UniProtKB/Swiss-Prot annotation:
Compartments where located: Mitochondrion matrix
Coiled coil, from the record: none
Membrane-spanning residues: none
PROSITE patterns listed in its UniProt record: AMP_BINDING
Key word Cytoplasm present: no
Major subcellular location class: mitochondrion
Protein name: Acyl-CoA synthetase short-chain family member 3, mitochondrial
Family: Belongs to the ATP-dependent AMP-binding enzyme family.
Role this protein plays: Catalyzes the synthesis of acetyl-CoA from short-chain fatty acids. Propionate is the preferred substrate. Can utilize acetate and butyrate with a much lower affinity.
Listed GO MF terms: acetate-CoA ligase activity; ATP binding; medium-chain fatty acid-CoA ligase activity; propionate-CoA ligase activity
Reactions it catalyzes: acetate + ATP + CoA = acetyl-CoA + AMP + diphosphate; propanoate + ATP + CoA = propanoyl-CoA + AMP + diphosphate; butanoate + ATP + CoA = butanoyl-CoA + AMP + diphosphate
Gene coding for it: ACSS3
Organism lineage: Eukaryota, Metazoa, Chordata, Craniata, Vertebrata
Modified residues annotated as N6-acetyllysine in this record: K524
Sequence positions that bind CoA: E227, P228, G229, R230, R624
Length: 686
């Protein structure tokens, strides 16, 4: 069965249309589709694979590419898109009819699973390793070729279709760091379903709010997650989430982890993964439009409504493929390791989709930097699997350093293939940066991006010849496509080394979010209204004379805990819901290991007879149940009153400064300035 709209035409070298492409239509599954085509173009053009150059670091290629991306983005990204296989060529590279949203590769059709898996097999690379699964918490190591991944993914796609999932439907994934989580992501992408993968560390309340918001037809989960020293039962967490919430999915697909007891299934609702896969029919890729949502990923925010970032398929595929070579400097076939979690944007972009799109081997690590079993774990993984480049958070490096300051446990390993260490997720302090360089003996490069962008905003683009020894404290230069500027509150451009608002001049490049799920008003209001014509990153920082960006702080109330963005407002809401606390403000307290940890300033209710110690114990437990251990909430200071503005707002920046022993300014809007002195005194006594 070949839908008429799949009668693709081949773009000729002159850019015109050639004859119809015959394509192929394998008789597998209900949704057989034409094999995607590569829209041909000159190799080595701007943004293409041929532009990769691991040069001396003069940055001349970077300058050329960045200038081209700003002055002629259509041509630049059109060339980059030639490295992706398309069922139907796009009619327009860029469209800005509905600003601030930019549509990329308009009317083009593709499938990201085809690009990440099938096409490598068709190009004779089916026996190459796609995934290395390394799980010290279960003492398991396994490798999976592209052929093996395709077999699992295509069958799982068949399972989903059998149970009513079709293009445009939503699927929630709540799984640990196991290959089956990646298979589920790719299977959803294969049939055009929209996945929403939720970090396994979130408690039932957080899971419930996301399920209610995304309304999945199916939830895919596993029997257990494994943490050092304990086992997390996922199914009871899902059950509790469904009790709390309103939405009830049609089916729950449960993967029972090997060598552990099987969890009981609810008749009529629950499906056993192994049983379903044993009788599954493989399903082919379903073409989707470039703008079709690939996934919804929830990010912390200051508003009560969940912020579900929508990722458009086409631009994302183009940007990720381009970034693996141009930013990270990798050749197809090399081993790449992003030491993150699939539940975060790094996991989506650079554990799953990015490396597979580029034909790399990706490491899926179910473990920690320390404690699984010790601070030598990262060195072992790098050595055993021949990793060429690692991406991790500074917190992980700090944890290793804290337990093994001289890196004695790492010295037994030979890191001959290791060439670059990239860090992101939080600001990397200079001390951690220098220690990493000395220990790993490779360039250590900080870079900066956000859930909303899906890939780096600033970086040292080593594939384009950027320096591998940038000044300490910076987070790289503007990535091609991201025209980063520093503005004051009056939208005036600031000079070098002047602290201001970090913004990006529109249009945003391919791969950036296209909206917020069921909340387009917030999309426009939060990101584009304060600085018309720009994307507001809501971060503050400055640029130096060479164009390096220094990200200094977050301008909203999101606390970065060990690279995880946690909303202070969500913690406050949880504390207040306990009933013992009348008022509270949560701010980030600087922490040598985690970067920041939340500290609550609490005002007790007058009718509470319990001691402050008892209340603290209770609210810590309450937050853990509501948000999960990922919040890392353990400390509170009890005060008589909180400072407020006349409109009732808490001056977070001033409180954050007090908590961290820094100077602060009392603005004229504060109702009772004397309360600041009381807060300072209570912090000293704590």
């Amino acid at each position: 069965m070949k839908p008429s709209w799949l009668q693709c035409r081949k773009v000729t070298s002159a850019g015109g249309l050639g004859g119809p492409l015959p394509g192929s239509s394998p008789a597998r599954g209900a949704g057989a589709a034409l094999r995607a085509l590569v829209v041909p173009g000159p190799r080595g053009g701007l943004g293409g694979r041929g532009c990769r150059a691991l040069s001396s670091g003069s940055g001349s290629e970077y300058k050329t590419h960045f200038a081209a991306s700003v002055t002629d983005p259509e041509r630049f990204w059109g060339k980059a898109a030639e490295q992706i296989s398309w069922y139907k060529p796009w009619t327009k590279t860029l469209e800005n009819k509905h600003s601030p949203s930019t549509r990329w590769f308009v009317e083009g059709m593709l499938n990201i699973c085809y690009n990440a898996v099938d096409r490598h097999i068709e190009n004779g690379k089916g026996d190459k390793i796609a995934i290395i699964y390394d799980s010290p918490v279960t003492n398991t190591k396994a490798t999976f070729t592209y052929k093996e991944v395709l077999e699992q993914v295509s069958k799982l796609a068949g399972v989903l279709v059998k149970h009513g999932i079709k293009k445009g439907d939503t699927v929630v994934i709540y799984m640990p760091m196991i290959p089956q989580a990646m298979y589920t992501m790719l299977a959803c992408a294969r049939i055009g379903a929209i996945h929403s993968l939720i970090f396994g560390g979130f408690a039932s309340k957080e899971l419930s709010s996301r399920i209610d918001h995304v309304k999945p037809k199916v939830v895919v989960t596993a029997s257990f997650g494994i943490e050092p020293g304990r086992r997390v039962e996922y199914v009871p967490l899902v059950e509790e989430a469904l009790k709390i919430g309103q939405h009830k999915p049609d089916k729950i697909l449960i993967y029972n982890r090997p060598n552990m007891e099987a969890v009981p299934l609810a008749p009529g609702r629950d499906l056993d993964w192994d049983e379903e896969m044993a009788k599954a029919q493989s399903h082919d890729c379903v073409p989707v439009l470039s703008e079709h949502p690939l996934y919804i990923l929830y990010t912390s925010g200051t508003t009560g409504l969940p912020k579900g970032v929508i990722r458009p398929t086409g631009g994302y595929a183009v940007m990720l493929h381009w970034s693996m070579s141009s930013i990270y400097g990798l050749q197809p076939g090399e081993v790449w390791w992003a030491a993150s979690d699939l539940g975060w944007v790094v996991g989506h972009s650079y554990i799953c989709y990015g490396p597979l799109l580029h034909g790399n081997t990706t490491v899926l690590y179910e473990g920690k930097p320390v404690g699984t079993p010790d601070a030598g774990a990262y060195f072992r993984v790098l050595a055993e699997h021949g990793v060429a480049a690692l991406f991790t958070a500074p917190t992980a490096i700090r944890a290793i350093r804290q337990q093994d300051p001289g890196a004695a446990l790492g010295k037994q390993y030979s890191l001959t293939r290791f060439k670059t260490l990239f860090v992101a997720g939080e600001r990397c302090d200079v001390e951690t940066l220098e220690w990493s360089k000395n220990v790993f003996r490779v360039p250590v490069l900080d870079h900066w991006w956000q859930t909303e962008t899906g890939s780096p905003i600033t970086a040292s683009c080593v594939g384009l010849g950027n320096s591998k020894t940038p000044p300490p404290g910076q987070a790289g230069k503007s990535v091609p496509g991201y025209n980063v500027m520093i503005l004051d509150d009056n939208m005036q451009k600031l000079k070098a080394r002047c602290l201001g608002n970090i913004v990006v001049k529109l249009p945003l490049p391919p791969g950036a979010f296209s909206g917020l799920w069921k909340n387009q008003e917030a999309f426009k209001h939060l990101y584009f209204e304060k600085f018309p014509g720009y994307y507001d990153t809501m971060d503050a920082g400055y640029m130096d004379e060479e164009g390096y960006l220094y990200v200094m702080s977050r301008v909203d109330d999101v606390i970065n805990v060990a690279g995880h963005r946690i909303s202070a407002g969500a913690i406050e809401e949880s504390i207040l819901s306990h009933g013992t606390v009348a008022d509270c403000a949560v701010v980030g307290k600087e922490d040598p290991l985690k970067g920041h940890v939340p500290l609550a300033l609490c005002v007790l209710r007058k009718d509470i007879n319990a001691t402050e110690e008892q209340v603290l114990e209770e609210i810590v437990k309450h937050v853990r149940q509501n948000i999960g251990p990922v919040a890392a909430f353990r400390n509170a200071v009890f005060v008589k009153q909180l400072p407020k503005t006349r409109s009732g707002k808490i001056p977070r920046s001033a409180l954050s400064a007090i908590v961290n022993g820094k100077p602060y300014k009392i603005t004229s809007t504060i109702e009772d300035p004397s309360i600041f002195g009381h807060v300072e005194e209570m912090l000293k006594q704590a």
